[in-house]
Amino acid sequence: MDRKGFLDSPSTKILQDLAVAPVDLTTPGIISQERVERFSLSIGGFTLSYATERVDEGVVSALTDLASERGLVSSMQAMQSGEVVNYIDNFPSESRPALHTATRAWVKEIPLTGNAEDIALRSKIEAQRLKDFLHQYRDAFTTIVQIGIGGSELGPKALHRALKGCCPSDKKVYFVSNIDPDNAAEVLQEIDCSKTLVVTVSKSGTTLETAVNEEFIADHFLKQGLHFRDHFIAVTCEGSPMDDRSKYLEVFHIWDSIGGRYSSTSMVGGVVLGFAYGFDVFFQLLEGAAAMDLAALAPQMSENLPMLAAMLGIWNRNFLGYPTSVIVPYSAGLEYFPAHLQQCGMESNGKSIAQTGEIIGFATSPILWGEVGTNSQHSFFQCLHQGSDVIPIEFIGFLDNQRGRDIVISGSTSSQKLFANMVAQSIALAKGRENTNPNKSFRGNRPSSLLVAERLTPYTMGALLAFYEHKIVFQGFCWGINSFDQEGVTLGKDLANQVLGIMQGQAKEGACLEAEALLKLFNSTQKKKS
């Protein structure tokens, strides 16, 4: 990566000039067959169309140069080969590799060395251990409950939901993440504990929410006359407080170099997916992810799908100045995927410190959010079409449905109607429509992209997961920030312990005056009502 900085790159000035008058998507006939073909890329079963982005050949050329100047390919090579990429210069930091790609490299026997080879070999061993465990115990349980928060819940939950429509399963799966006791209590009301396997996921083995929820659920099992070790397994780092086979039925390992939000292809996602759908389905997901890992190493942006998507996002964020971006999958199976991408993107790139340790002077991660289509058309699309802010949209769609069941009504299937709506929204946002009634007028020039595959399968889902991981990481490399730590989550947790001490009467008076004032207000006003 070029250490000069994002703003000092020669292509940054060129792109700033080009952004003064970007392509006008409302120009009649501009979204032509020629433009659609020119501004598209098909790789690994996916086609990305960006003809409805506010780009022309000059912009794409400058983005290509910027990617080269910022050393995106070499940085991706460094990450996948196990070099230390999680660091901040001259300050204490985690200072370690980011090796989520190694958790699936073994399925394609990708040649690796050093740290990457070590994690790939360990991942293969853990996968075989999981396969053996499932062979021995999968039929003994009808239900699995995964306890974990952040990356230990969002990614696995999104993947489990995504595969539900294409992979038969007679297993029930639940996730408990929130420290709110109602979360765990609701799950406990719905399960037969005697037939339930609980997997507790925590890298450190000390995550507060996870530890509390495990104890909450274990207490209920004990009251049912069930033994902890017969029903609880763990996924954690070697040597953590949870790495105890005398306590758990089984313990599976992850490693410090696997970030939580990037851990779904490790045992963090493998156990629950293997239990729900079988080991072979998890293996197919790994194959898709590994294929996209290789695609992310392509040296030219014109052949590198996640890099192209990343640089289009850079154009929208840093040069057109759009502060937020919405992800809209036209697939019921991707119901929870936007929430996973929200964490992956904003926790990775929601930074204002460069890896040089300096405060940066430009925008980084946009606010990410989303919902499936067509549901979202009936909620927030009003704002996308006519709101005061321009919000770029990333559409995700599939030509065929997962379950193979459909019906023809008024000459078209439901799948065709779904796909037609996605394409129509992209065109409508770009072109707009004039009307003498200003309330019915659409100004257009609302950029979007469409990422399309044939069908959502385990392989496709793995590739889609890795596509977004690499898109996010490429943007971090371009900005020169550390996409692999999350110091921003620590301050609130530290203060929560102080507040809890005040609530328990264990803190010295004046330890946190702000908390004391707020607690006094809420206790006095709410107790009056009760």
From Swiss-Prot:
One of its GO terms (cellular component) is cytosol. InterPro entries: G6P_Isomerase, G6P_Isomerase_C, Phosphoglucose_isomerase_CS, SIS_dom_sf, SIS_PGI_1, SIS_PGI_2. It catalyses: alpha-D-glucose 6-phosphate = beta-D-fructose 6-phosphate. GO terms for biological process: gluconeogenesis; glucose 6-phosphate metabolic process; glycolytic process. Catalyzes the reversible isomerization of glucose-6-phosphate to fructose-6-phosphate. Belongs to the GPI family. This is Glucose-6-phosphate isomerase. It comes from Chlamydia abortus (strain DSM 27085 / S26/3) (Chlamydophila abortus). The lineage of its organism: Bacteria, Pseudomonadati, Chlamydiota, Chlamydiia, Chlamydiales. The gene is pgi.
